């Protein structure tokens, strides 16, 4: 736990350059005066984070904007964004770096900020549980505000009933910064736990380059909301279930028999 301490006014640990691997460390309670404290502040180089826990930090991991930096997050847990503040604390916030891979990790109990937000050039979000859960009130569950290449495969992405924002996955809200803008969603389960209709995936076509590619394949949506009807692109094999068809609170994502 940080216990009010930080490195360089930024984080519990600051990774400035080089090739690093961090394993089996728990990062808690990171705060700094500007509201952007982090468990890890990753600035440049290559970093792999494996089997770590990030809890009650202003940001779990926060990166800088060096376009040659690469971040991999494997089998880690991000939870419990701080409350009692007007700041937007993201559990994982990735800046304009070369690449991001997040695999086998869990994100839950956000508050006003996002569970995972990335401005990276290339993104691979694979086989994770982004489930805001009871007591969570994150904004977006997953956002790529500046586009880029984003592969989102095999995740369970679940929005809390207490979320103030209907969008579950967002792409390109601030336009397309990168030369390649491509969103592929496949084999994901997207859940709305509230009674307000969700926007399961929103891509801002008017703000993105005309050659932007959006493809969805074999995704399952659960609960009220719009998916491909409000999403331009190529869509195949997606299926919708009504509210209550799954039991996210019990981590039961088996669909009913038909």
Q: What do these predicted regions represent?
A:
Residues 2-16, 23-257:
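Glycine- and acidic/polar-rich repeat regions and solenoidal domains
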């Amino acid at each position: 736990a940080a216990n009010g301490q930080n490195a360089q006014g930024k984080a519990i640990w600051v990774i400035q350059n080089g090739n690093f691997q961090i394993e089996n460390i728990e990062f808690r309670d990171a705060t700094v005066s500007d509201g952007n404290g982090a468990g890890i502040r990753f600035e440049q180089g290559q970093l792999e984070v494996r089997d770590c826990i990030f809890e009650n930090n202003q940001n779990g991991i926060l990166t800088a904007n060096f376009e040659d930096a690469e971040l991999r997050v494997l089998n880690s847990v991000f939870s419990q964004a701080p409350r009692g503040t007007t700041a937007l604390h993201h559990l994982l916030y990735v800046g304009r770096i070369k690449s991001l891979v997040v695999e086998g990790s869990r994100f839950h109990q956000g508050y006003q900020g996002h569970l995972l937000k990335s401005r990276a050039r290339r993104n691979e979000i694979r086989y994770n549980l982004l489930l805001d859960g009871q007591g969570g009130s994150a904004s977006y569950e997953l956002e790529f505000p500046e586009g880029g290449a984003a592969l989102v495969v095999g995740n369970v992405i679940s929005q809390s009933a207490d979320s103030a924002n209907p969008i579950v996955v967002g792409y390109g809200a601030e336009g397309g910064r990168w030369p390649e803008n491509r969103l592929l969603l496949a084999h994901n389960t997207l859940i709305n736990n509230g009674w307000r209709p969700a926007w399961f995936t929103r891509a801002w076509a008017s703000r993105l380059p005309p050659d932007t590619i959006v493809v969805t394949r074999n995704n399952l949506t659960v609960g009220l909301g719009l998916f491909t009807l409000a999403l331009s692109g190529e869509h195949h094999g997606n299926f919708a279930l009504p509210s209550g068809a799954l039991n996210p609170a019990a981590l039961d994502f088996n669909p009913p028999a038909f």
